[in-house]
Amino acid sequence: MKVVLLKDIPGIGKTGDMKEVKDGYARNFLIPRGLAKMATEGEIKRIRNEKILKEHKEDLTKKKSEEILKTLQKQIHKVPAKVGGGGKLFGALTSTNLSEILSKNSGVEIDKKWINMDKPLKETGLYDIEMRLPGGVRGTIKVEIVGEEKG
């Protein structure tokens, strides 16, 4: 029996795949649990249309992410921070702080999950920060922590 998978099933396929399975497996397990539907003409057309829409949406997401990354890579982002002796920060610069600063400076909403930092930055200096944007877009931006002497 041909079925269209509604959810990912290990060993069989992914959501939207059309698979040939044994009749009993489809009738007694997959269909009653909402894991698959019988592959009718209407269902096949609907799945194809959904795949086309999903691919189109992914292309748009990737293009938008590439534009955001290019915008961020155009400049060195200066981050003012209060420092003590030896260039040590009072506190630390985390991905949350950095996302807020980048969002404010670039005018584009930057999610903290896009910023890949192993640990918070605690000293002044120039840093290469890895970005992982939606759509599989990756790149690095430059961030410079500039000290403001506490007075």
Swiss-Prot record:
PANTHER family in the record: 50S RIBOSOMAL PROTEIN L9
Keyword Glycoprotein included in the entry's annotation: no
Q: What is this protein's function?
A: Binds to the 23S rRNA.
Q: Which InterPro entries match?
A: Ribosomal_bL9, Ribosomal_bL9/RNase_H1_N, Ribosomal_bL9_bac/chp, Ribosomal_bL9_C, Ribosomal_bL9_C_sf, Ribosomal_bL9_N, Ribosomal_bL9_N_sf
Q: Does the keyword Ribonucleoprotein apply?
A: yes
Protein name (record): Large ribosomal subunit protein bL9
**Keywords attached to this entry:** Ribonucleoprotein, Ribosomal protein, RNA-binding, rRNA-binding
Q: Which GO terms describe its cellular component?
A: ribonucleoprotein complex; ribosome
UniProt superkingdom: Bacteria
Mention one GO molecular function: rRNA binding
Supply the HAMAP family for this chain: Ribosomal_bL9
